[in-house]
Amino acid sequence: MFKAIRRVFTMIPRIQLTEKETRICNLLKDYTAHYNSLHYGQEPLTLRITGGWVRDKLLGQGSHDLDIAINIMSGEEFATGLNGYLLEHFDKYGVKPHSIHKIDKNPEKSKHLETATTKLFDVEVDFVNLRSEEYTEDSRIPTTQFGTPEEDALRRDATLNALFYNIQQDAVEDFTKRGWQDLQDGVLRTPLPARQTFLDDPLRVLRLIRFASRFNFNIEAGVLKEMHDPEINEAFNNKISRERIGVEMEKILVGPNPILGLKLIQRTHLENVIFLWHGDQSVIEYNRKNWPQTKDVEDIYKKGIFNHHLKNFIHHYKDFLSRYLKLRQAIETKDKSFQQNFLLASILIPMADLKIIALPKKKLNNTLPVSESIVREGLKFNKASSIVVARCVENIAAYNSMVEKYLQSGDLKRSEVGTFLRELRGDWEIVHYVSLMDQYLKYISRKDNVVNIIDKYDRFWNYIQEQNLQDSDKMVPIIDGKRMVKILETKPGPWLGKINDEVILWQFDHPQGTEQELISFIKSILPNYLQ
């Protein structure tokens, strides 16, 4: 006879289902009843929605992640049976059976835990069996087997993520006995002792930090204390892929309260393993042996320079936003990648002017700014983000010099500013903010200087707008190459590219210039390039 499940229904509010969720649950209830009628006397099939969906619904938020745990069979077995049921009852539900995407067990990758995915009423649903897990010392990938609801709840990263919605009972189950209370209190607590939980799977540290920053929750004091453990830090570096770290960090950086996430990272001294300057140990070792700047890079971590900068940035960030409304408006109105890239560039200011050898086997052009390497190789973010972040960090000093030059001269040539902005490839605004942040952090102790610095940068910003230079990177010669060759009655050659550079400068300095005036200018300088 099957083992009875101890029910853990507490005074938790009923979940309000959407119309589509109701249809899905009604279908699953019907199929479950059908299955159990055919297997009378055996342990009944029970379905539970698990994870973030339950948490989000109880918080009154929408959720699109439907993960359904099954007690007596694999996800693939269940989905196959459900599809057969849909074939027989198409008239009742109007749902065509979909192909089942099976994700087999794979001990090398934690994301592959024998899950089956299909669609119900145009909603993607994952089915997986209830699991218990056993870890080894050298991997965060557990050995999994069928488990009870209690075992499945206890293996989760936080009690408030271990709440289950029993579909048949239309009720929330709290097998940890703390999940609902912790959700009400806004407390993140591990179901099992935190130290072993984190050693088993250090990614849980970063996940708790992400949930804290997303919901503005507190991490329970004892759990937070364990996050400081150097052994956890080491396990983090040894057990977790850079891609997994990057996924969590991206969610933190584009989330509603990234500064809280960064604060927790700084407090737990995880910045040295999260913002690693390269993810490939062989590249790291090569640089240590062959590249003198490697010591400078690693000293930034070892001597606490990075941690101190991160702490300083976090401490002053809100004050900076309150003083500089342009940045606040940009964060609120631009794509979320803007917030992510601004934060990353500001965090990585200490890495300015430092490079590493990124491609040891390549003889030429094999170096990369450390800031770009951290984003691309350490966090495994996309190439576009890594380039923008590096462009910001590597141009901090140059941008500040341009601001000072403009203020001292009072009347820079329009072409000088335009050419400089062209070099920033359309990213001048974010470079502006990061360079200003660098100056702000340097002079924050002297309040009068801070006001002065913001005023300087504002005046330069206004000059760019007044001179209509904000789209300098998009400027093209008003006479294209083919027409130019025809007008000048000469053959194309290397001179054409050089003339085009001169044309761009002329157009910057003559915003009202006519085509005829430009032709006269080109003819006047052409002999210099045809010699």
From Swiss-Prot:
Q: What CDD domains does this protein's entry cite?
A: NT_ClassII-CCAase (cd05398)
Enzyme type, top EC level: transferase
As for subcellular location, the record says: Mitochondrion; Cytoplasm; Nucleus
Q: Which GO terms describe its biological process?
A: tRNA 3'-terminal CCA addition
Q: Which domain of life is it from?
A: Eukaryota
Q: Which reaction does it catalyse?
A: a tRNA precursor + 2 CTP + ATP = a tRNA with a 3' CCA end + 3 diphosphate
One GO molecular function term? Answer: CCA tRNA nucleotidyltransferase activity
* Residue ranges of coiled coil: none
Which InterPro entries does the UniProt entry name for this protein?
Answer: NT_sf, PolA_pol_head_dom, PolyA_RNA-bd
Q: What is this protein called?
A: CCA tRNA nucleotidyltransferase, mitochondrial
Species of origin reads: Candida glabrata (strain ATCC 2001 / BCRC 20586 / JCM 3761 / NBRC 0622 / NRRL Y-65 / CBS 138) (Yeast)
Q: What is the lineage of its organism?
A: Eukaryota, Fungi, Dikarya, Ascomycota, Saccharomycotina
